[in-house]
Regions:
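Short, solvent-exposed polar/charged micro-motifs at secondary-structure junctions
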Residues: 54-59, 89-93, 182-184, 224-226, ...
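Active-site acidic/histidine proton-transfer and metal-coordination neighborhood
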Residues: 92-214, 224-225
Length: 278
């Protein structure tokens, strides 16, 4: 859906689906049911979550052509893909594994480039297309930052090529979150400063980074870091960083001295997902 100059999409990552067959089934059932409730008769934007398996399968044979036809038939469109979770995201222990493989691994690069091949086909020229991804790595992994920089730069070059071929504005959004390689406004600025410094030391053109790599701003994650949304976004944009996408999500606020509050949040102490608390 479009509101003035911005597009709002329904993100499908809440629906369990790992293969393309499972993903397409979710789109044809659950997602269309949501569309009919909130945007009946209107053009409906889908924020598509694709696992590495689903992305590979979608690129086989004529699957992508069929999906494009289905989107047109259902008056839907895709302008963004959630490329953070590479593998299983439901029904198993996810937690820090959601960061695997991280940006030190070639498999993360290949997967993300496949997502850009897909989004470059699907997204309208008017909106452009984005893919969101993890903030390089998980803090506790102690990742080699130079490998992160090298793989991200390679991805930026691929995005640049696809953007020129399609005439569409394409960009990757790194998503800061608690315990990520960078997790708040200050660390995000510092990461990009090091990224550009690395680029200079390697005598590489910084424009692919400036034009095609930005921030996927999750309102819940930054709230957990006690970063004021307006000030944080202003600081990032004034530093010349692109806001690739904004995830509208909520953080819970409670009194840690209140026994009832502690009891109410106890169910979140479960083995599947990270539930960051600050």
């Amino acid at each position: 859906m479009k509101f003035e100059s911005h597009h709002l999409a329904y993100c499908t990552n809440i629906h369990p689906a790992e293969s393309w067959t499972e993903t397409f089934h979710v789109l044809k059932t659950d997602v269309l049911a949501v569309r009919d409730r909130v945007a009946s008769g209107k053009k409906f934007a889908i924020g598509l979550r694709l696992s590495a398996q689903a992305a590979l399968e979608l690129l086989e044979n004529d699957q992508l052509d069929q999906f494009e036809s289905w989107l047109a038939q259902e008056n839907c469109y895709v302008f963004t893909i959630n490329g953070f979770p590479y593998g299983a995201f439901h029904g198993t222990r996810v937690k820090e594994n959601v960061y695997k493989p991280d940006w030190t691994h070639m498999s993360r690069l290949v997967y993300t480039e496949q997502l850009f091949t897909i989004i470059s086909r699907l997204c309208p020229a008017e909106s452009g297309g984005s893919v969101s991804t993890l903030p390089g790595s998980f803090k506790e992994f102690g990742a080699d930052e130079n490998l992160i920089f090298a793989n991200l730069y390679s991805c930026a070059l691929t995005i640049e090529t696809l953007a020129k071929e399609t005439g569409k504005d394409l960009h990757l959004g790194l998503e800061p979150e608690p315990l990520g390689h960078f997790e708040n406004t200050e660390e995000t600025l510092a990461f990009f400063e090091r990224f550009f410094a690395w680029c200079g030391s390697e005598k590489l053109d910084p424009n692919p980074i400036k034009n095609h790599i930005g921030i996927n701003y999750d309102t819940c994650h930054f709230a957990l870091e006690f970063n004021d949304c307006h000030q944080s976004l202003r600081t990032l944009t004034e530093a010349g960083l692109r806001i690739s996408k904004i995830h509208l999500s909520n953080a819970l606020s409670f009194d840690p001295q209140n026994p009832k509050a502690l009891e109410a949040i106890r169910p979140f102490d479960e083995p599947t997902y990270l539930h960051q608390v600050i």
